[in-house]
């Protein structure tokens, strides 16, 4: 199960256009060109580069283009979430009029860095639960954006995996423990696994170097299927790990697997 890539790109394009209707001039430096910061927790490759381009396209369609009447400052943490606070602070020093945070960790870093600059987030699992907004209908504060309610979707994905492979009773959840949603995702999925009569082993990975040990652990635990939690680092990680470490005992390509994003397949 996954979101359609084209629709997701079209949505980010529309979001960029909507952001462009905000009164940039009032928040920009007096007499200067407004600066928009884009804060990424992922690397500038694949779907993330596509979505960044879609955001720029939306701005362009609304009449704002880089170098003419808008400056775009982009920062990529390349999966190293501990770099995000410094990157957010750097954007603030650039006097950005707005920060677009395309993942939960980047939105968390932006939120911690400022209470005044508007922050627009996307692909946030549960912005209310993690304290980004007061409610979905009345966000309050300086953050707004969209949610895909991933914390609620997760148990349904596990149920679908169970229906697709009913013989698999021991499953692995690959999750990034540094993601702000990690605890709530783990608890919800453990509860769902219990209701389904499944064993769900939580396996952590937050860096490239964690991936092979994670899959080795999944093999040692005799897991029969894999669920990948939604996370900017993990989105391309299983695929790249398969390419680089085909001799790993547990290979994602040989196990049934599910994720919210097709990019892990």
Question: How would you label these PLM feature ranges?
Answer:
Residues 1-265:
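Short hydrophobic alpha-helices and adjacent helix-cap/hinge residues
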């Amino acid at each position: 199960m996954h979101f359609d890539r084209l629709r997701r790109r079209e949505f980010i394009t529309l979001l960029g256009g909507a952001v462009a209707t905000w009164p940039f001039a009032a928040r920009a430096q007096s007499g200067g060109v407004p600066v928009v910061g884009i804060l990424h927790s992922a690397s500038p490759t694949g779907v993330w580069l596509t979505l960044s381009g879609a955001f720029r396209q939306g701005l362009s369609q609304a009449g704002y283009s880089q170098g003419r009447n808008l400056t775009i400052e982009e920062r990529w943490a390349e999966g190293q979430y501990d770099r995000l606070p410094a990157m957010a602070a750097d954007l603030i020093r650039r006097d950005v009029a707005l920060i677009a945070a395309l993942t939960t960790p980047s939105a968390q870093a932006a939120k911690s860095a400022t209470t005044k600059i508007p922050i627009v987030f996307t692909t946030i699992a549960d912005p209310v639960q993690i304290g980004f907004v007061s409610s979905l209908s009345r966000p309050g504060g300086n953050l707004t954006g969209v949610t895909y309610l991933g914390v609620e979707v997760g148990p349904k994905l596990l149920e679908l995996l169970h229906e697709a492979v009913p013989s698999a009773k021991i499953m692995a959840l690959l999750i990034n423990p540094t993601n702000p949603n990690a605890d709530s995702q783990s608890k919800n999925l453990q509860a769902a696994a219990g209701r389904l009569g499944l064993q769900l082993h939580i396996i952590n990975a937050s860096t490239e170097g964690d991936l092979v040990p994670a899959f080795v652990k999944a093999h040692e635990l005799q897991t029969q299927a894999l669920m990948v939690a939604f996370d900017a680092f993990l989105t391309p990680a299983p695929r790249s790990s398969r390419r680089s470490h085909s001799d790993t005992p547990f290979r994602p390509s040989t196990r049934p697997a599910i994720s919210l994003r097709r990019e892990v397949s």
